[in-house]
């Protein structure tokens, strides 16, 4: 498997996990998601969004949240922020919880 197809497989798995988690979300908030052209958009009741974009040339996933944008690299079986070292789903849970106004956990 070449490096680009491996990256796409890992990014697909990441987005599928997000979809499955949101499909099973039992909170009061309505969180919609849409994936188009490798870009996933989460839309919250208050109109705020989280956009998760693939950066194929860099082999990174870039989520943009209300609080800011982040770059994540895949290593040791997980995605980690290139600046803080924080794990992807921890950061996504934090951002989604803030934007939904209730706890949203992806991990």
From Swiss-Prot:
This is Iron-sulfur cluster assembly protein CyaY. Involved in iron-sulfur (Fe-S) cluster assembly. May act as a regulator of Fe-S biogenesis. The lineage of its organism: Bacteria, Pseudomonadati, Pseudomonadota, Gammaproteobacteria, Enterobacterales. CDD domains: Frataxin. Disulfide bonds: none annotated. GO terms for cellular component: cytosol. InterPro entries: CyaY, Frataxin/CyaY, Frataxin/CyaY_sf, Frataxin_CS. It holds the Pfam family Frataxin_Cyay. Gene3D superfamilies: Frataxin/CyaY. The keyword Signal does not apply. The gene is cyaY. Keywords: Iron, Metal-binding. GO terms for biological process: iron-sulfur cluster assembly. Belongs to the frataxin family. Transmembrane segments: none annotated.
């Amino acid at each position: 498997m070449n490096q680009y197809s491996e990256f796409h497989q890992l990014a697909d798995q990441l987005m599928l996990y997000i979809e499955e988690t949101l499909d099973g979300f039992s909170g009061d908030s309505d969180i919609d998601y849409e994936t188009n052209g490798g870009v996933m958009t989460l839309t919250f009741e208050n109109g705020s969004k989280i956009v998760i974009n693939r950066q194929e040339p860099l082999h990174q996933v870039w989520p943009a949240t209300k609080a800011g944008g982040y770059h994540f690299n895949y290593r040791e079986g997980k995605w980690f922020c290139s600046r803080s070292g924080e794990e992807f789903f921890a950061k996504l849970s934090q951002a989604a919880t803030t934007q939904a106004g209730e706890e949203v956990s992806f991990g």
